[in-house]
């Protein structure tokens, strides 16, 4: 489901690594 959408390198690289900048995505990755 959601993992497929965040599979993009550009998106994942910024929000996945910098969870502080994207707190909204924090619950999706945790």
From Swiss-Prot:
Matches recorded under InterPro entries: Beta/Gamma-Crystallin (IPR050252), Beta/gamma_crystallin (IPR001064), G_crystallin-like (IPR011024)
Biological processes annotated in GO: lens development in camera-type eye; visual perception
Molecular function per GO: structural constituent of eye lens
Keyword Repeat: yes
Top-level taxon of origin: Eukaryota
Keywords tagged on the record: Eye lens protein, Repeat
SUPFAM superfamilies: gamma-Crystallin-like (SSF49695)
All copies of domain Beta/gamma crystallin 'Greek key', residue ranges: 1-30
Domain note: Has a two-domain beta-structure, folded into four very similar Greek key motifs.
Quaternary structure, from the entry: Monomer.
Stated role: Crystallins are the dominant structural components of the vertebrate eye lens.
Family classification: Belongs to the beta/gamma-crystallin family.
Protein name per its UniProtKB record: Gamma-II crystallin
